[in-house]
């Protein structure tokens, strides 16, 4: 079961065919050859993290290995996409390392795990998944044809979204699924912020406003909408909240909050949040408490209006008049 507030350590012993790469949250401490020719991969014990963030990926993958400030960085894909990986590797790693440096400065703490692998896998039923130290992506982001600028920007956003989860989601995890927004809202906001501030894709917020925000406007006017922070009774129910409200609307609302508080208070609040909750779990109240302490004002009223209430602000007008002349008019919000 995936109860995010139950964290555990993991120790793996994996027997695999010779020549296979075996990837998990940390690097295997030892790889030995068994009498039958297979390989035994012995992993040391991991740090504590939630069960839904555990991964084991194994296969005859192609690998590109680099490092950033002594942190191992790996890129993996199936052999038939070797050329596509080679063509994309420099840009993928450039965006990754730019994001790592940006987040380390913003959060007041460096990348928290011992290595960072990115695996581009086939037949993956999600765009990407933030497994600790071993993020999986659908391999369609390794472009088969020359990519457009827009395709590269969106790929960069996905890379930085998953990287942000190493702090928001993996290092500090929601206590229960009703705080899914703490993971996805912030990863979306942070990915566009870092994309615009730290990479070549300086127009990222224009893309967000033109392509992402309208999806949230549309969904928020449906009877099926929900608040950003919403009650979830069981794990299956949480699946329905991976949508434009949690991602795009949430990111827009956090951007508004940062503008209201000021960037200095926002940074200070993030530092407090991670100092208090690193390697543990947190709730809406925990996060708002850290930001409110940094800003010197409570955020409960703001939360009720923007995080805990569904639908969007609408403006209507009524008027009265005769003979083609408006004699009175009222605006309603």
PLM ranges: what are they?
Residues 43, 74-332:
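Hydrophobic alpha-helical and helix-loop surface patches within well-folded domains
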Residues 5-6, 34-35, 67, 110-112, ...:
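Extracellular/periplasmic catalytic domains that process cell-envelope and extracellular macromolecules
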Residues 1-61, 65:
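Extended, low-hydrophobicity, Ser/Thr/Pro/Gly-biased non-transmembrane segments
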Residues 19, 70-72, 115:
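A generic structural signal for alpha->beta connector loops
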């Amino acid at each position: 079961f995936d109860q995010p507030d139950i964290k555990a350590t993991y120790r793996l012993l994996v027997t695999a065919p010779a020549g296979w790469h075996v990837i998990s949250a940390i690097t295997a401490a030892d790889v030995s050859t068994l009498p039958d020719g297979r390989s035994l991969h012995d992993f040391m014990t991991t740090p504590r993290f939630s069960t839904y963030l555990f991964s084991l990926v194994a296969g005859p993958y192609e690998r590109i290995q680099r490092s950033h400030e002594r942190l191992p960085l790996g890129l993996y894909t199936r052999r038939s996409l070797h050329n596509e990986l080679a063509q994309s590797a420099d840009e993928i790693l450039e965006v990754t390392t730019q994001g790592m440096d940006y987040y380390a400065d913003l959060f007041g703490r460096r990348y928290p795990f011992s290595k960072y692998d990115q695996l581009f896998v086939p037949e993956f039923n999600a765009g990407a998944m933030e497994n600790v130290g071993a993020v999986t992506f659908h391999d369609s982001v390794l472009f088969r044809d020359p990519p457009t600028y827009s395709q590269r920007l969106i790929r960069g956003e996905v890379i930085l979204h998953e990287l942000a989860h190493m702090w928001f989601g993996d290092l500090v995890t929601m206590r229960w699924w009703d705080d899914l927004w703490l993971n996805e809202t912030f990863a979306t906001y942070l990915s566009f912020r870092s994309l615009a501030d730290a990479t070549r894709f300086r127009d990222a917020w224009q893309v967000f406003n033109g392509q992402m925000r309208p999806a949230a406007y549309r969904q928020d006017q449906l009877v099926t909408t929900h608040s950003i922070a919403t009650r979830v009774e069981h794990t299956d129910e949480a699946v329905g909240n991976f949508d434009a409200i949690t991602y795009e609307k949430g990111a827009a609302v956090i951007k508004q909050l940062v503008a209201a508080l000021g960037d200095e208070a926002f940074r200070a609040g993030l530092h407090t949040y991670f100092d208090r909750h690193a390697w543990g779990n947190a709730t809406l109240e925990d996060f708002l408490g850290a930001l409110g302490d940094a800003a010197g004002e409570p955020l409960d009223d703001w939360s009720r209006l923007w995080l805990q209430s569904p639908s969007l602000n609408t403006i209507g007008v009524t008027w009265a008049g005769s003979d083609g002349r408006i004699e009175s008019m009222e605006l309603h919000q």
